[in-house]
C-alpha cells in the first residue's frame, strides 16, 4: 500500500474565478511530463464559476449535492451525484451549486488551466 499525504490546505476559490464562496482541495497535480490536474471543488449554495473556457476541454464529476451548469446559448441543466459533464475545448460555460443546495465536484483539466 502507498499513501500520498496531502501537502496543501483547502484554498478559498479566487474571486475572479467564482461568485459566492467556493473551496478547493487539490486531488492530482502534474508529475513528470503529465499535464493532468484535478481538484475537489466545494460550492456553497448559489456559488458558481464565472463564464470560462478550456482549450483542451474540462470534465466535472458531481460527488455530492445538487448543481447547475450551462454552456453558452444552451439551457441551464441540473446535475446530481454521479453525473459527469464534459465541456468541449473552447466551449464557454459555467457550473456551480443550485441556489439552495451545496454541490461538490471533481474537476479535471490541463494543469495550465483552472479546474
PLM ranges: what are they?
Residues 109-115:
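Conserved small/polar residues in nucleotide/adenosyl-binding loops
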Residues 49-51, 69-70, 87, 92-99:
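Short beta-strand His + acidic residue motifs that chelate non-heme Fe in jelly-roll/DSBH
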Residues 45, 55-73:
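Glycine- and acidic-residue-biased ligand/ion/polar-headgroup-sensing regions
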Residues 23-26, 37-54, 89:
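Conserved short histidine dyad/triad with adjacent acidic residue
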Residues 73-90:
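Short acidic-glycine-tyrosine-enriched beta hairpin
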Residues 1-35:
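A short, N-terminal "cap"/entry segment at the start of jelly-roll beta-barrel domains
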